[in-house]
Regions:
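Short loop segments and helix-boundary regions at transmembrane helix junctions
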Residues: 30-113, 209-221, 240-241, 264-266
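Transmembrane helix-bundle core of multi-pass membrane transporters
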Residues: 4, 8-13, 84, 92-153
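Transmembrane alpha-helical segments in multi-pass inner-membrane proteins
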Residues: 198-247
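Membrane-helix/interface signature in polytopic inner-membrane proteins
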Residues: 145-178
């Protein structure tokens, strides 16, 4: 039955997209959690709707407009993080609200094109194109290479920014580049995962991995493995149950998180 399903081109593209997303999404999600920036993924995913709406309204490429808007938002978030360290949640709330407001206004002005905005709101990994799959693999390769090359500096930056600065690391530049890469990754994930669920797919596998893994590297491996298993299970279940893939994947991750939380004392005891 599964072999028959794999014969479909759309399912092959969906599986490839899952593999790519499961590589970079948990890694970025882990750093976001440890940097106490979990809301950043939510903020950028909501701001991305403004990019989609601008593209639709102006008749331009929604992908490129989303990338531009999300990168700008990532830069603004980094500025606000440095300038208002104790009020970061306020700035993320403002950006999130502004992104949604701009998206709704431009969507209303675009009229019949509002359905295009809905498709980005909920996403569909089943309808992803070959070009989008290639883009996901490119960002996956970039994130993987950067992680392998700079895992120690990023580790130091994440846990002790002051020490990283004393050691001569370009703290502001590294933090800025991390935000930009995260923003690009989120923008590319939107067509597959949807604005409403992209944050869950980024954060939950990393959070589950943190409950299981004993070292930083093991947490990364666990998060990637959980992301891959959860997303593959989600697309197969969604196909046979005729449910939205993104929502199904999210519920699977939540179930994983619940089970791991219940059995966490046993895992820690071992």
């Amino acid at each position: 039955m599964i072999s028959e399903l794999l014969a479909y081109d759309f399912m092959q593209r969906a599986i490839l997209a899952v593999i790519a997303i499961s590589i970079f999404s948990p890694i970025l999600g882990l750093f976001l959690i440890l940097r106490r920036q979990s809301l950043m993924s939510d903020t950028l995913s909501h701001v991305s709707l403004a990019g989609v709406a601008v593209g639709i309204f102006l008749g331009l490429s929604t992908t490129w407009m989303t990338l531009v808007v999300v990168v700008i938002a990532a830069l603004v978030l980094e500025y606000l993080r440095v300038s208002y360290k104790h009020y970061m949640e306020i700035s993320t709330a403002i950006l999130m609200s502004m992104g949604l407001a701009v998206a709704l206004i431009l969507s209303n002005k675009a009229g019949s094109s509002s359905m295009s905005l809905d498709s980005y709101l909920f996403g569909s990994i089943i309808t992803i194109s070959s070009e989008q799959v290639r883009a996901l693999f490119i960002i996956a390769a970039i994130v993987l290479v950067l992680t392998l090359l700079f895992i120690r500096p990023m580790y130091l930056l994440t846990f002790d920014e002051d020490t990283a600065h004393v050691d001569g690391l370009p703290v502001r530049l590294m933090s800025l580049l991390f935000n930009i890469v995260t923003g690009i990754a989120i923008a590319l994930m939107i067509p597959a995962a949807g604005t409403l669920l992209v944050s869950t797919i980024m954060i939950l596998p990393a959070a589950i991995g943190m409950k299981i893994g004993q070292t930083f590297k093991s947490v990364i491996f666990w998060a990637i493995g959980i992301g891959l298993v959860g997303m593959l299970s989600g697309i197969f279940i969604s196909y046979y149950w005729e449910t939205p893939a993104s929502a199904t994947i999210t519920l699977i991750f939540i179930a994983f998180f619940g089970l791991v939380s219940i059995f966490e004392p046993l895992l820690k005891a071992e």
